[in-house]
């Protein structure tokens, strides 16, 4: 069997290695248009910031190591420019010489990835404007920063890579402004959870311009102007365009393969395209949302690696299947961590799901052990079935651990109240005897058994309009003074028993 793989990095490289482990006799050829066949693109911002000092650490495999370890032929700086399905061949262009040749295949795996979105606007040709997707992009940005020593940078977009780059530039002493068309950063989070991230960036000196659209760029002597709708242009020494990515599916489209959401390549659960001899994996493919069943894009390294493995398995006769993505994600925001899995409220509403949400802010470990800090957990579950729909956590230490527990619970089909019964590891430096995940389960259980009723901030307008309703804030005096909602009276919880007479027994209390 001869297998040609178009693209390396996560999906293609994983497929190649898995194929070799399953079939020693297969002929495996990888064509990669960049100069690096397998690299840690999630680590690119940290190389720019100097956190990762040795760029070789970002290179996971080289053509030489692929050949020596796996007997796989890898050709970098080679781009597949056409697929000829009728004769099962691809046209390959050597990007260094311009020469073209054909390579036949028995099976073809497409892993072209995604491209940074570059909308039609003026100034995209400026040498002071960058995107970040490849090692070459990284080297270009780092070289610019080291040589030009920019004092200001404007970053358009509020996604993972862009925010990680913003943090690293800020840590290098660059004054950073983030321009985001939406009213929040990090769309996997709901706005209430993203507000913690906004506050952290602002506390670190990063300027946020939300609900602001970039309309173009203009290079001037020694600077680049970022033009925004309804405002004065922003002057900086460099700008980064990070407004998202789109699936690089042009090769598949020209070959007549079926496409799906946003032009992504349509695949089945075995990662087969509409041509049974062609598979596709990674950021270019359409995947099923494991919670809602809807089809869309998930541009994350974890799913891409798993898809590469599944495609290789199926090629070799194994019944592996990809059952959808929970899109579990995590990001470092200076000393803070934000993470999400499953769907958020916006997606739940779009899917027409009837859901309940709970929000809690426990400490990451035992309160008496030094260094404890609060994390905020937001959990969504379906009202009727009680299945967990999604979760978001923002905090400091221990956020990543808790989001992984919740992602596992979702995939295992656990119901929200069952989180109360999870037997999780405990020692004072790491957790509490009642772990934050258990506490989320306790709250869900109390709600569903009728022991507790809850209301949310968005319910306040309605509650205030009702006659005879008392609004009670049981936080400490200091917490109340630091900020409270209008219309609430403050009776600290520890004083409540002694002050019950201040409440009207004939009025509902919220």
Predicted features, each with a name:
Residues 59, 152-153, 160-218, 298-304, ...:
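Rossmann-like dinucleotide-binding cores of NAD(P)H-dependent redox enzymes
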Residues 110-172, 207, 267-269, 489-499:
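Glycine-rich dinucleotide-binding loop and its adjacent helix/turn
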Residues 125-149, 232-313, 405, 409, ...:
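FAD-site-proximal beta/loop scaffold in flavoenzymes
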Residues 103-113, 156, 234-244, 308, ...:
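Short hydrophobic core segments
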Residues 1-79, 117, 166-189, 328, ...:
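Beta1-alpha1 glycine-rich phosphate/pyrophosphate-binding loop at the start
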Residues 1-2, 8, 284-397, 428-432, ...:
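Mid-to-C-terminal Rossmann-like scaffold of FAD/NAD(P)H-dependent oxidoreductases
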Residues 121, 459-510:
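Positively charged, proline/Ser/Thr-rich regional signature most characteristic
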Residues 25-27, 69, 75-96, 103, ...:
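A Rossmann-like FAD-binding core segment of flavoenzymes
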């Amino acid at each position: 069997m001869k297998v040609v793989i178009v693209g390396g990095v996560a999906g293609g490289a994983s497929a190649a290695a898995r194929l070799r482990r399953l079939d020693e006799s297969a002929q495996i050829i990888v064509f990669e248009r960049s100069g690096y066949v397998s690299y840690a693109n999630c680590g690119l911002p940290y190389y720019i910031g100097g956190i990762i000092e040795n760029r070789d650490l970002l290179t996971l495999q080289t053509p030489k190591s692929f050949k020596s370890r796996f007997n796989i032929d890898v050709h970098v700086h080679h781009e597949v420019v056409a697929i000829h399905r009728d004769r099962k061949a691809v046209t390959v262009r050597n990007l260094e010489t311009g020469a073209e040749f054909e390579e036949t295949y028995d099976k073809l795996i497409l892993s072209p990835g995604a491209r940074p979105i570059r909308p039609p606007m003026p100034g995209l040709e400026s040498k002071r404007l960058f995107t970040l997707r490849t090692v070459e992009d990284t080297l270009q940005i780092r070289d610019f920063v080291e040589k030009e020593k920019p004092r200001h940078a404007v970053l358009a977009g509020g996604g993972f890579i862009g925010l990680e780059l913003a943090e690293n530039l800020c840590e290098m002493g660059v004054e950073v402004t983030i321009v985001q068309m939406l009213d929040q950063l990090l769309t996997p989070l709901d706005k209430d959870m993203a507000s913690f991230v906004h506050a952290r960036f602002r506390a670190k000196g990063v300027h946020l311009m939300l609900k602001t659209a970039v309309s173009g760029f203009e290079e001037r002597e020694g600077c680049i102007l970022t033009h925004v709708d309804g405002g004065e242009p922003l002057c900086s020494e460099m700008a980064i365009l990070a407004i998202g990515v789109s699936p690089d599916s042009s090769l598949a489209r020209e070959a007549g393969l079926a496409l799906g959401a946003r032009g992504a390549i349509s695949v089945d659960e075995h990662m087969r395209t509409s041509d049974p001899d062609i598979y596709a994996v990674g950021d270019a493919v359409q995947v099923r949302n494991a919670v809602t069943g809807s089809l869309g894009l998930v541009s994350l390294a974890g799913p891409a690696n798993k898809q590469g493995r599944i495609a290789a398995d199926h090629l070799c006769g194994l019944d592996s299947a990809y059952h959808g993505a929970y899109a579990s994600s995590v990001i470092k925001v200076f000393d803070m961590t934000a993470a999400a899995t499953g769907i958020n409220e916006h997606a739940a509403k779009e899917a027409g799901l009837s859901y309940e949400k709970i929000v809690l802010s426990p400490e990451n470990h035992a309160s008496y052990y030094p260094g404890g800090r609060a994390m905020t957990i937001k959990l969504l579950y379906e009202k009727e079935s009680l299945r967990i729909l999604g979760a978001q956590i923002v905090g400091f230490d221990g956020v990543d651990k808790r989001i992984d527990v919740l992602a596992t619970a979702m995939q295992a089909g656990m119901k929200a109240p069952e989180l109360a019964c999870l037997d999780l590891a405990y020692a004072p430096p790491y957790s509490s005897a009642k772990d934050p995940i258990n506490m989320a389960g306790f709250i869900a259980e109390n709600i569903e058994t009728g022991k507790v009723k809850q209301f949310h901030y968005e319910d306040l307008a309605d509650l205030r309009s009702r006659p005879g309703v008392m609004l009670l804030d049981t936080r400490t005096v200091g917490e109340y003074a630091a900020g409270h909602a209008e219309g609430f009276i403050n009776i600290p919880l520890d004083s409540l028993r002694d002050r019950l007479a201040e409440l009207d027994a004939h009025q509902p209390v919220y």
